[in-house]
Amino acid sequence: MLFSFFLLLTCTQLCLGTNRPDYNDDEEDDYKPPVYKPSPSKYRPVNPCLKKPCKYNGVCKPRGGSYKCFCKGGYYGYNCNLKNACKPNQCKNKSRCVPVGKTFKCVCRNGNFGRLCEKNVCSPNPCKNNGKCSPLGKTGYKCTCSGGYTGPRCEVHACKPNPCKNKGRCFPDGKTGYKCRCVDGYSGPTCQENACKPNPCSNGGTCSADKFGDYSCECRPGYFGPECERYVCAPNPCKNGGICSSDGSGGYRCRCKGGYSGPTCKVNVCKPTPCKNSGRCVNKGSSYNCICKGGYSGPTCGENVCKPNPCQNRGRCYPDNSDDGFKCRCVGGYKGPTCEDKPNPCNTKPCKNGGKCNYNGKIYTCKCAYGWRGRHCTDKAYKPNPCVVSKPCKNRGKCIWNGKAYRCKCAYGYGGRHCTKKSYKKNPCASRPCKNRGKCTDKGNGYVCKCARGYSGRYCSLKSPPSYDDDEY
């Protein structure tokens, strides 16, 4: 054990050396530690950082056979023995520090000044009235004013004293310094102008000026024009001695002399009289009314209410004061305002023995009760009608009685005397033989086409002039 310690001590002295020159920490460090290359040995070399060569808390890192110092706190040099005057940076307000020998110099910016750039041209703020200070160059500044203030330090207010005349209101303007808002009637940069002085309106018109430097004239009744220079009654528009006066709304009215009318008294509506048949003309200003004598009517009494006779069927016409101007006295049973309604012959009950009377407006017919016949149902029927008594036609067949015999007209699908036999005969209308909207009707052994208006022929295929009667075949 003692032998090993001796060998270690000998190796330490050999590797590190004992005659290292001394150095002053305040001087430039030119010392370079030697690089030792010991001969191969079975013993490991000693770490060069064990003697802590790095000053002021520098961190030592071995590098091959030597070491390297990583300095802290503004120190530099191979062994961190030299001091950097700019670390830490003592210059204020983000200014740049420049080392000068063992001391330093501050390069100021943004309006800062002083040894450490600790002062600023905008602190305290030299701008008055809430003006905003901005550094200008190294030692200068610029004030951005607000609220209508101007001047190098915002010490002057643009609206004090008020430059606006005639009760105009002053408002600060960032472009021109101020702006005037004039009351009605005044205009100009300082509200010094009034368009109504002197008054440009003639004939007692009232002038009203606006804030834009323009004016308008309110004219007295009867006067008009941009400056009330014209009069509605000059020259006089009323004819035939009519008197002109203003209507109060920019126009005129004419007071006409007797017998004349119209807007300018040019018309005498009753001369010559427009009323005929001794009717009396009444002047209504620009119009007239005719008062007609009895029996005449119309706007000019030119119509005789009874000529031509409005009463029909030999009725007699009499003038009266009704809305129509006449009244009809009907004869022969006719009725209505103009005797147009014919008498109903059924009112006299011409059908006897329970017969029913039917009137179509032209003639009447009697539908007799069973057992009676004739025009007025006065003749007895000696042979009973089997169509009524026994109803011989079956299956919706139609019974036809001619007074002597009957026959059955069977419905489609049935045949025989009494329509009791089924018939498989094809319906002739199934093929739609009738053209142009014609209506097909089965007639037992054939069919009949009832043509629409304007067509004719068996199949309604022929065009024909319009007729009130439809053709059947």
From Swiss-Prot:
Signal peptide positions (record): 1-17
Main location: secreted
Compartments reported by the entry: Secreted
Tissue: Produced by the byssal gland.
Keyword Acetylation listed: no
Pfam families attached to this UniProt entry: EGF (PF00008), EGF_TEN (PF25024)
Domain EGF-like: from-to ranges: 45-81, 82-117, 118-154, 155-191, 192-228, 229-265, 266-301, 302-340, 342-378, 383-420, 425-461
Molecular function terms from GO: calcium ion binding
Swiss-Prot/TrEMBL keywords: Disulfide bond, EGF-like domain, Glycoprotein, Hydroxylation, Repeat, Secreted, Signal
Modified residue annotations for 3',4'-dihydroxyphenylalanine: Y23, Y31, Y36, Y43
GO CC field: extracellular region
Residues glycosylated per entry: N93
InterPro entries registered for this protein in UniProt: EGF-like_Ca-bd_dom (IPR001881), EGF-like_dom (IPR000742), EGF-type_Asp/Asn_hydroxyl_site (IPR000152)
Disulphide bond pairs: C49-C60, C54-C69, C71-C80, C86-C97, C91-C106, C108-C117, C122-C133, C127-C143, C145-C154, C159-C170, C164-C180, C182-C191, C196-C207, C201-C217, C219-C228, C233-C244, C238-C254, C256-C265, C270-C281, C275-C290, C292-C301, C306-C317, C311-C328, C330-C339, C346-C357, C351-C366, C368-C377, C387-C399, C393-C408, C410-C419, C429-C440, C434-C449, C451-C460
Free-text description of this protein's post-translational modifications in UniProt: Contains L-DOPA (3',4'-dihydroxyphenylalanine).
Aminoacyl-tRNA synthetase recorded as keyword: no
Functional note: Provides adhesiveness to the mussel's foot. Mussels produce one of the strongest water insoluble glues. The mussel's adhesive is a bundle of threads, called a byssus, formed by a fibrous collagenous core coated with adhesive proteins.
Protein name as catalogued: Adhesive plaque matrix protein 2
Protein source organism: Mytilus galloprovincialis
Highest classification ranks of the organism: Eukaryota, Metazoa, Spiralia, Lophotrochozoa, Mollusca
Gene that encodes it: FP2
